[in-house]
């Protein structure tokens, strides 16, 4: 079994402006510096003495020597009567090395790749009429018998980007398991509500086009859906039976703009 030779010690004064260690000529594997416990108060001349032995290089030793060199430099800094923040910063600058902090920015268009919060729900108007898909792109409001409740459409309500306030929440209303979303477009001189087919690979997304966005407002136990593209125009139903839903302006008037919402799953 190999035996470890006894280290031979000698004393030398140590000083370095560059905080470098002293190494053997053949590389950093063998090292000359070994720090022994120091009593700085006992050194009259204020110098730093290191005891030298042949030992393997250790990263922790480099840190210890760096701190000792920093202490040596501190001895040469004139002491002020009051310790201030600037003094503390100068001490830290001797011991720690600053590293740049890099902030990454992202394009808003990339946010569509992130998950969009949504819930599934059913809507009934104030007269308890349910919404059903009467044709591929037409929603109608009518009273359903118990045996026909499965005809009622289920909405996927997505929470999207918009002008959110304390009482208004921007949402998009899509039909569950269908590539159809309610949207608002101008036809002639009047905003019109329609079901628009979309690409399921792209929708829903956080940054929806404004025609798909409705500001949901809760009033007591009911909700209203105002078009974000056409303010003061609301998703409405007629008091007559089995009529298509539409965009109306007579809030609280003849047309019905308030709905009850049954949440199926958050």
From Swiss-Prot:
UniProt keywords, alphabetically: Cytokine, Cytoplasm, Inflammatory response, Lysosome, Mitogen, Pyrogen, Secreted
Subcellular location field: Cytoplasm, Cytosol; Secreted; Lysosome; Secreted, Extracellular exosome
Listed CDD domains: beta-trefoil_IL1B
Disulfide bond residue pairs: none
PROSITE patterns: INTERLEUKIN_1 (PS00253)
InterPro entries tied to this protein: IL-1_CS (IPR020877), IL-1_fam (IPR000975), IL-1_propep (IPR003502), IL1/FGF (IPR008996)
Residue ranges the record assigns to the propeptide: 1-113
Molecular function terms from GO: cytokine activity; integrin binding; interleukin-1 receptor binding; protein domain specific binding
GO CC, any one term: lysosome
GO biological process, one term: positive regulation of tight junction disassembly
Record site: Important for interaction with integrin: 168, 176, 178, 187, 201
Family: Belongs to the IL-1 family.
Function: Potent pro-inflammatory cytokine. Initially discovered as the major endogenous pyrogen, induces prostaglandin synthesis, neutrophil influx and activation, T-cell activation and cytokine production, B-cell activation and antibody production, and fibroblast proliferation and collagen production. Promotes Th17 differentiation of T-cells. Synergizes with IL12/interleukin-12 to induce IFNG synthesis from T-helper 1 (Th1) cells. Plays a role in angiogenesis by inducing VEGF production synergistically with TNF and IL6.
Subunit structure: Monomer. In its precursor form, weakly interacts with full-length MEFV; the mature cytokine does not interact at all. Interacts with integrins ITGAV:ITGBV and ITGA5:ITGB1; integrin-binding is required for IL1B signaling. Interacts with cargo receptor TMED10; the interaction is direct and is required for the secretion of IL1B mature form. Interacts with HSP90AB1; the interaction facilitates cargo translocation into the ERGIC. Interacts with HSP90B1; the interaction facilitates cargo translocation into the ERGIC.
Note: IL1B production occurs in 2 steps, each being controlled by different stimuli. First, inflammatory signals, such as LPS, stimulate the synthesis and promote the accumulation of cytosolic stores of pro-IL1B (priming). Then additional signals are required for inflammasome assembly, leading to CASP1 activation, pro-IL1B processing and eventually secretion of the active cytokine. IL1B processing and secretion are temporarily associated.
Name assigned to this protein: Interleukin-1 beta
Protein source organism: Delphinapterus leucas
């Amino acid at each position: 079994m190999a035996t470890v030779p006894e280290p031979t010690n000698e004393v030398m004064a140590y000083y370095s402006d560059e905080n470098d260690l002293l190494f053997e000529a053949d590389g950093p594997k063998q090292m000359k510096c070994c720090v022994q416990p120091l009593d700085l108060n006992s050194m009259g001349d204020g110098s730093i003495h290191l005891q030298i032995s042949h030992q393997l290089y250790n990263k922790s030793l480099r840190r210890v020597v760096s701190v000792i060199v920093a202490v040596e430099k501190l001895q040469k800094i004139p002491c002020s009567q009051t310790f201030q923040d600037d003094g503390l910063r100068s001490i830290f600058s001797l011991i720690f090395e600053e590293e740049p902090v890099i902030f990454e920015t992202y394009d808003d268009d990339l946010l569509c790749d992130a998950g969009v919060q949504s819930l599934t729900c059913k809507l009934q108007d104030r007269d308890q009429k349910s919404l059903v898909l009467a044709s591929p792109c037409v929603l109608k409001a009518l009273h359903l018998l118990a045996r026909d409740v499965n005809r009622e459409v289920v909405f996927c309500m997505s929470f999207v980007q918009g002008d959110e306030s304390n009482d208004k929440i921007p949402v998009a209303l899509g039909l569950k398991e269908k590539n159809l979303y309610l949207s608002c477009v101008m036809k002639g001189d009047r905003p019109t509500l329609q079901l628009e087919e979309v690409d399921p690979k792209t929708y829903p997304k956080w940054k929806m086009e404004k025609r798909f966005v409705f500001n949901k407002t809760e009033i007591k136990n009911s909700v209203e859906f105002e078009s974000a593209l056409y303010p003061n125009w609301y998703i409405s139903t007629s008091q007559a039976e089995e009529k298509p839903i539409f965009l109306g302006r007579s809030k609280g008037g003849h047309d019905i703009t308030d709905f009850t919402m049954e949440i199926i799953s958050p």
